[in-house]
């Protein structure tokens, strides 16, 4: 176990160092609680193209269906840590911008409470905000221009505590039903600003405007999950997974200002200030509605040899509102509305033969594809767009310690957006370590 914690410490230190030294410019992350890339951004999901709802095993933790924790074996302690490196290319109007980022994808653990009750806890990145966009436009009837600068940074993390139960399980080769739930704590902050900067030979007589907002999130959400397994003969098993994210209104704390200023040399001097909240106060509370989310997964497995799986997910984001309770929205009418979100993923491959005599036979080789109809719909003068994403990925599993632990290496490509607006192409490499230790064992001595 000491080796496991040593590897964990080194991986955590490396991941935090990479995160501190790199960033990714994602303009779409300026809306709502920013870009939620789960589950595809984690190596567990990426190894099969984003398939997660019907997957469960004794040597890894799947936080995307809480019912899967019930597959953890008695006397076991499973610990997972994963990281991801991403190289992105943003295409905007024929211009390309490249970025590189490293993130700690997940830290999870799971262990049994009783033979029928298992528990899990972990930390996941829920969303990330990182963008800076500059647009320069002429002012009608003048020789001056106005430069609009969009800035944003921050992110939301998710700490979860989950429990799963064997509703019925008559033994190996018999049908089984597992049920579980996750209690999620979302926390973090997102800072956004828009600056209207007048560009001229002498800007001393121009009043610039800045809108800025900081949103602090601290909320509890819930996920529910079911997993049913039906043996088909002696060799095959059909699994059906169902998940549900409970809809609710999230209370968030905001701090916002809209003010004008002038610049003399390198100094800014504030003139007039508007407080968007009710009353003469920069701090206020607003509401963000979190919609229902439903996930359904099907998989067919042949005796721990190969697997094929299909996922479908739906979230009715249309009608979702942002900055409720604010008399004067900080960012005004941005032309953005939310659209229903759909995701489909298909994956499979050789998952490894644990009894194979050659090591290559115990290795796993999997892959998959996914398509997602995005959360945002842009209502622009030239037409309507939905922001869609598609991607492909591969995964290689290296078993360790007689198959109780494993190292998963993944690689993937995804494309988000459109050529008519903005397109973000991402190459990613993931690394996940799952350690399955035998705890809670009473040793016998003669």
Residue ranges and their predicted role:
Residues 12-13, 75:
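Alpha-helical transmembrane segments and their juxtamembrane interfaces
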Residues 15-17:
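N-terminal signal peptide c-region/cleavage motif recognized by signal peptidases
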Residues 21-46, 116-446:
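Outer-membrane beta-barrel porins/channels
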């Amino acid at each position: 176990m000491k080796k496991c914690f040593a590897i964990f410490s080194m991986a955590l230190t490396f991941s935090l160092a990479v995160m501190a030294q790199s960033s990714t410019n994602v303009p779409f992350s300026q809306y709502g609680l920013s870009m939620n890339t789960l589950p595809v951004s984690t190596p567990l999901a990426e190894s099969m193209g984003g398939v997660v709802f019907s997957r469960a095993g004794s040597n890894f933790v799947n936080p995307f269906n809480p019912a899967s924790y019930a597959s953890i074996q008695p006397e076991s302690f499973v610990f997972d840590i994963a990281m991801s490196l991403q190289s992105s290319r943003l295409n905007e109007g024929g211009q390309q911008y490249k970025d590189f980022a490293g993130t700690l994808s997940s830290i999870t653990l799971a262990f049994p409470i009783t033979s029928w009750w298992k528990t899990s806890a972990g930390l996941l990145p829920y969303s990330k905000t990182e963008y800076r966009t500059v647009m320069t436009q002429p002012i009608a009837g003048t020789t001056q221009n106005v430069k609009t600068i969009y800035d944003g940074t921050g992110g939301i993390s998710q700490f979860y505590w989950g429990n799963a139960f064997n509703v019925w399980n008559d033994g190996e080769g018999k049908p089984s039903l597992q049920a579980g739930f996750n209690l999620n704590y979302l926390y973090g902050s997102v800072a956004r600003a828009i600056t209207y900067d007048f560009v001229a030979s002498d800007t001393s007589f121009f009043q610039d405007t800045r809108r800025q907002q900081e949103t602090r999130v601290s909320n509890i959400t819930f996920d529910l999950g079911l997993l049913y397994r039906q043996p088909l003969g002696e060799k095959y098993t059909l699994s059906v997974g169902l998940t549900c994210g409970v809809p609710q209104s999230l209370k968030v704390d905001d701090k916002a200002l809209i003010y004008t200023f002038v610049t003399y040399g390198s100094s800014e001097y504030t003139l007039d200030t508007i407080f968007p909240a009710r009353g003469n106060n920069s701090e206020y509370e607003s509401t963000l509605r979190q919609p229902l989310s439903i996930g359904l997964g099907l998989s067919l497995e042949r005796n721990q040899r190969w697997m094929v799986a299909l996922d479908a997910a739906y979230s009715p984001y249309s009608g979702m509102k942002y900055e409720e309770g604010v008399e004067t929205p900080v960012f005004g009418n941005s032309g953005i509305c939310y659209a229903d979100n759909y995701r489909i993923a298909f994956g499979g491959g050789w998952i490894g033969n644990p009894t194979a005599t050659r090591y290559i036979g115990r290795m796993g080789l999997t892959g998959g594809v996914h398509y997602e109809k995005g959360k945002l719909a842009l209502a622009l003068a030239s037409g309507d767009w939905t922001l869609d994403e598609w991607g492909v990925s591969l995964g290689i599993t290296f078993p360790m310690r007689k198959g109780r632990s494993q190292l998963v290496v993944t690689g993937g490509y995804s494309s988000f957006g459109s050529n008519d607006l903005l397109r973000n192409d991402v190459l990613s490499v993931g690394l996940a370590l799952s350690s399955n230790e035998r705890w809670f064992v009473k040793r016998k001595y003669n």
